[in-house]
From Swiss-Prot:
Any Pfam family matching the protein: Toxin_35
Identification of the protein by name: U11-lycotoxin-Ls1b
Family from the record: Belongs to the neurotoxin 19 (CSTX) family. 10 (U11-Lctx) subfamily.
Location in the cell: Secreted
Signal peptide stretch: 1-20
Expression across tissues: Expressed by the venom gland.
Organism: Lycosa singoriensis
Length: 77
């Protein structure tokens, strides 16, 4: 019985360590990648630009994308 409990605890510890390594080893978000839920996760040469989606003047959504620093996008009509 003690062996089963010990084995279970060891397996739990190993799985926890593997998950922690995966989370800490994640790379940054690349150019034009979505950063809505993680605004600080863009690569070092990029910034997270956010845009409000409006319908009849009311905000219905917010979307963020990693874009180049010092670059301005304008709507072409």
């Amino acid at each position: 019985m003690k062996l089963i409990i010990f084995t279970g605890l060891v397996l739990f510890a190993i799985v926890s360590l593997i998950e922690a390594e995966e989370e800490s080893g994640r790379g940054c978000i690349l150019l034009y990648g979505e950063c809505t839920k993680a605004t600080g996760s863009c690569c070092s040469n990029l910034i997270c630009d956010c845009y409000r989606k409006l319908k009849k003047g009311v905000q219905i959504a917010r979307q963020c994308f990693c874009s180049e620093k010092d670059v301005i996008y304008k709507k072409d009509i």
